[in-house]
A protein has these predicted regions:
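Active-site-proximal segments of metallohydrolase catalytic domains
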Residues: 1-111
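Extracellular hydrolytic enzyme modules, especially secreted metalloproteases
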Residues: 75, 81-201
């Protein structure tokens, strides 16, 4: 199914989300410029996103995405080419995440665009422990990152040190833990009951 199918199912029909697709946009710089690591972030990922937003502005009416009339687009979702650093990409690729562009955001069509989430286009094919090829990613990471826009936290060991991070979660049984990778991302886990309650579903 699609991301729309996932959210419709998890909300018992309450949340009927549709995605409008714009692009693709060719970036003027290479992966390393945008994705090289700095402490707790990628170097110029927000420059990448702002460049993409400006490139699609002429063909996109951003006012359509202000769902509550507050002058701000609720969120935008970016899918960037290639692998992500969380799954097969090297340190020069972008880590899938949810964040804001800046303290002020970007103004397009009179709307502030600020909250965003992003994930990679592809996932790796491994052979002998090495990435030998890629194929299209499933919906799992998209659903996981978009769920942060809905207010859900990560439910896995976010410092990867066995400390529990924000929480050990339920592993493959929970989208917000490692369940986004089930079936190569094509069969992501459901939300837990607590997560549905958190969102109001």
């Amino acid at each position: 199914g699609s991301g729309s199918d996932y959210f419709r199912d998890q909300s018992n029909g309450v949340f009927n989300l549709t995605f409008d697709v714009a692009g693709p946009v060719m970036m003027p710089e290479n992966y390393a410029y945008y994705g090289s690591n700095i402490p707790y972030d990628d170097a110029n990922v927000r420059t990448m996103l702002t460049t993409a937003l400006n490139a699609i502005d002429a063909d996109t009416d951003f006012s359509r995405y202000d769902w509550n009339g507050d002058g701000e687009v609720e969120q935008v979702f970016f899918i960037y080419a290639g692998l992500g650093e969380a799954n097969g990409g090297d340190e020069n690729t972008v880590w899938p995440h949810k964040s804001i562009i800046s303290n002020q955001g970007v103004t397009l069509d009179g709307m502030t665009v600020n909250t965003y989430a992003c994930s990679a286009e592809c996932q790796p094919i491994y052979q002998g422990g090495y990435v030998v090829d890629t194929h299209i990613d499933g919906i799992g990471t998209i659903c996981h990152e978009f769920s942060h826009c809905l207010g859900l936290p990560d439910m896995y060991d976010t410092d990867y040190a066995g400390s529990g991070g924000e929480g050990y979660g339920m592993g493959a049984w929970d989208l917000m833990s490692s369940g986004s990778y089930n079936g190569n991302g094509f069969h992501p886990a459901c939300y837990t009951g607590a997560e549905r309650m958190w969102i109001g579903w």
